[in-house]
Amino acid sequence: MPNAIHALVTESRNPFSTHIDQLSTLDMLAVINQEDQKVPFAIENVLPEIAQAVDAIAETFMKNGRLIYLGAGTSGRLGILDASECPPTFGTPHEQVVGLIAGGQQAILKAVENAEDDRSAGEQDLRNLALNEKDVVVGIAASGRTPYVLAGIEYANHVGCVTVGISCNPDSALAALANIAITPIVGPEVITGSSRMKAGTAQKLILNMLTTGAMIKTGKVFGNLMVDVVATNEKLVERQKNIVMEVTQCDRQQAEQALLQSNGQCKVAIVMLLLNMSAEEAKNCLAQANGFIHQALTLVK
């Protein structure tokens, strides 16, 4: 590895928290809060690289490829969290965004010893998904040196995937391997080496951007409304109705009727009402427009 562990920024001591164990609760939290405020600025510095990754992911989605997150510990759990939120939020198939964690399913709730050091598992987990060149693989490792992640990225490169590396240390092995390196430098953690803190926060914000940006670019959002939301609970049933009413300026009864006729598909209900057509006609119109409402409306006009 190009960086010895002790030399990593994420492993260094934070001079602003050296006496945190002697502070009052309020002062302790003030230190943590002050350090957390550095995270968005670190991300601002890497927005061009995040944009590159978003464009690559959007392109792969349009070709029916997948986004696959690969991480260990906190990094792996964050990938799984982001992946699990995509189907209800954007109506995507569960296999479109996948999160892999070193140590497998059991590692989600409980740390698995030495799992992150298992290079062979990084490659094997991707093989088990039948990885192909249409997929984008995002390796997440605060240190930038996690063997499980590095091996996975090496294999993904071999397959011909676009690879992205998210780390919080400069000049990391992960950044060197990935096609697109996203490296927000958030500085030393409040508790030395606890990368679940600022580094984890930075990773979460970046993953939010990757999936949200790609979903916007593939027609899953109209204005700033999640028009492919799946109504899996009462709150989301109401959200669907509110979205349809907001876009079409119809009343609640019309929204409910359109959603019923469209089998709970917001997009279809919206196009039905705006263009005064049947559910089947609206579906066909959206299919011709690759799922983009703006384009569907233009097609008919």
From Swiss-Prot:
Pathway: Amino-sugar metabolism; 1,6-anhydro-N-acetylmuramate degradation; Amino-sugar metabolism; N-acetylmuramate degradation; Cell wall biogenesis; peptidoglycan recycling
PROSITE patterns reported in the protein's UniProt record: GCKR (PS01272), SIS (PS51464)
Entry keyword set: Carbohydrate metabolism, Lyase
EC number, as in UniProt: 4.2.1.126
GO process terms (BP): 1,6-anhydro-N-acetyl-beta-muramic acid catabolic process; amino sugar catabolic process; N-acetylmuramic acid catabolic process; peptidoglycan turnover
Molecular-function annotations in GO: carbohydrate derivative binding; carbon-oxygen lyase activity; ether hydrolase activity
Catalyzed reactions: N-acetyl-D-muramate 6-phosphate + H2O = N-acetyl-D-glucosamine 6-phosphate + (R)-lactate
NCBIfam families referenced in this protein's UniProt entry, alphabetically: N-acetylmuramic acid 6-phosphate etherase (TIGR00274), PRK05441.1 (NF003915), PRK12570.1 (NF009222)
Primary role: Specifically catalyzes the cleavage of the D-lactyl ether substituent of MurNAc 6-phosphate, producing GlcNAc 6-phosphate and D-lactate. Together with AnmK, is also required for the utilization of anhydro-N-acetylmuramic acid (anhMurNAc) either imported from the medium or derived from its own cell wall murein, and thus plays a role in cell wall recycling.
Family affiliation: Belongs to the GCKR-like family. MurNAc-6-P etherase subfamily.
Miscellaneous note of the record: A lyase-type mechanism (elimination/hydration) is suggested for the cleavage of the lactyl ether bond of MurNAc 6-phosphate, with the formation of an alpha,beta-unsaturated aldehyde intermediate with (E)-stereochemistry, followed by the syn addition of water to give product.
Subunit structure and binding partners: Homodimer.
Protein name per the record: N-acetylmuramic acid 6-phosphate etherase
Organism in which the protein naturally occurs: Pasteurella multocida (strain Pm70)
